[in-house]
Amino acid sequence: MWRHRSTGWRKGVKAMDKKLYLDCGSGISGDMFVAAMIDLGADPDALQKALDSIPTDGFFVEIGRVKKSGIDCCDFRVRLDDDCENHDHDMDYLYGSLAPAAGSGCSCHEEPDREEHHCHCHEEGYDGEAHHCCRQEKDHHHPHRGLAEILPMIDACDMTETAKALARKIFRIIGEAEAKAHDLPLDEVHFHEVGALDSIVDVVAAAVTFDSLHIKEVIVPKLTEGTGTVRCRHGVMPVPVPATVNIVSAYKIPMELTGAKGEYVTPTGAAIAAAISTSHQLPPSFVIKKAGLGAGKRAYTCLLYTSDAADE
């Protein structure tokens, strides 16, 4: 079942603004963030309307539950009808020998030292069935897109003006970072992986789910990133990739590198954090009113805590 929790108030108690603590100790990507927002209670109707209104075909979305190290969390996946669309979520393409073997079991196995991405199995949804937002593919060719093509797609989506503004902001952050990385004018940047269909869906879903929760403050103490290399259409790049480095540098987001190999923080995830962050400092104490757990492709999770209570 989808769950939605309104802020509300009790008699004699003033309703407080919601605050979100974004714990990125396991990194952040677009799908992890969306899953966590859904787990917190994002409006399912708003998400459905937004996804149905994206002016393109060839994708569907699955929302379900998976276990990471034995912990139940939400899983958000964008599936493409055309397998050749891109390699954003193709772990064998991205990491080569770092990726799990085909047919490997799901990530519910207790393997704390495991670095491989978990398999692409999909567990059943909240009510025992997988949730789908289906779109029939009309054209197997999806060209790489620039901001000139992406921003009108966002404007055409059925979501609030606030959500549209956030989605545009996220893509502009990514575009500026890519422009700097490739020494190109912003209007000449074409988004390869980031501009591919699944990433557009991730950004629209991130904007609409976050907007539906009416969060006023977002605390992002740091982003935890891996090391090593990752493969993309430009070749093999160091982790963190240049676009991610440019985002955390421009928006002064603290970053911590771990010894684990692989990309924990994607440019889309970094851009989402940059777009919504209002602070990097947690209060000395606080009351946790609800937690949302979003599953990524690896065998760890991104935890997000939100509080609409006053700091203590």
What are these regions (language model features)?
Residues 27, 76, 198, 273:
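Divalent metal-coordination and catalytic microenvironments
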Residues 18-38, 42, 46, 150-152, ...:
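N-terminal loops that bind phosphate or other acidic moieties
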Residues 2-15:
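Short, Lys/Arg-enriched N-terminal segments with co-localized hydrophobic residues
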Residues 218-304:
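Mobile "lid/hinge" segments at catalytic clefts and subdomain interfaces of large enzymes
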Residues 305-310:
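Conserved small/polar residues in nucleotide/adenosyl-binding loops
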Residues 16-17, 29, 72, 185-187, ...:
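Short coil/turn connectors at secondary-structure junctions
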Residues 39-181, 241, 250-255, 261, ...:
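Glycine-rich nucleotide/cofactor/substrate-binding loop typically near the N-terminus or early
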